[in-house]
């Protein structure tokens, strides 16, 4: 695929600086790249802030959302916000990232364990995965063996999976995006 803007979304515990030279290297391949800094929030607050920051960059559709680490499960919700703003998502790349999981029924905390928190006994809600997800092709780029299970799951989902080591991450990501 030929992306409009490649949006690099860092792990909620990190900052955009964690991408290092990757954005600039991807630009050298002729890609339009934004790496928004979404600090100090997680879950749906990360989704909301990312949507605002992405909008401020005036990206070109179709977007390719690249998620790292714990932001992986948030990509479907971030995509919903982009589609609502008439910025279609053309693909997803999970870079050493956790994967979105199917919806599950809410968990009821065991009051004997002290997890009721005074909110009806429910645990904190997970970020929902839209029923129509994925509406665009997905790929997985593995850098670390710590993500062997996620890479395996991505392959079982029929997604292209690539591996890379520094300094070849940009080249591997570019090749993966072309296959989407």
Task: Describe these PLM feature segments.
Residues 14, 41, 71, 100, ...:
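Surface-exposed, flexible loop/turn segments at secondary-structure boundaries
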Residues 37, 69, 144:
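Nucleotide-sugar donor-binding loop of glycosyltransferases
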């Amino acid at each position: 695929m030929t992306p409009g803007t490649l949006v690099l979304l860092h792990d909620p515990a990190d900052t955009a600086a964690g991408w290092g030279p990757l954005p600039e290297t991807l630009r050298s391949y002729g890609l339009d790249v934004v790496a928004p800094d979404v600090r100090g929030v997680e879950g749906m607050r990360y989704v909301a802030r990312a949507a605002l920051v992405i909008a401020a960059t005036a990206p070109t559709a179709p977007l390719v959302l690249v998620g790292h680490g714990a932001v992986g499960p948030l990509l479907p919700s971030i995509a919903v916000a982009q589609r609502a703003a008439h910025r279609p998502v053309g693909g997803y790349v999970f870079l050493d990232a956790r994967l979105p999981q199917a919806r599950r029924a809410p968990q009821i905390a065991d009051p004997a364990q002290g997890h009721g928190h005074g909110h009806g006994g429910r645990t904190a809600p997970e970020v929902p995965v839209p029923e129509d997800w994925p509406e665009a092709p997905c790929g997985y780029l593995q850098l670390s063996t710590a993500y062997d299970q996620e890479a395996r799951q991505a392959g079982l989902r029929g997604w292209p999976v690539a591996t890379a080591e520094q300094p070849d991450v940009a080249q591997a990501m570019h090749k993966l995006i072309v296959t989407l």
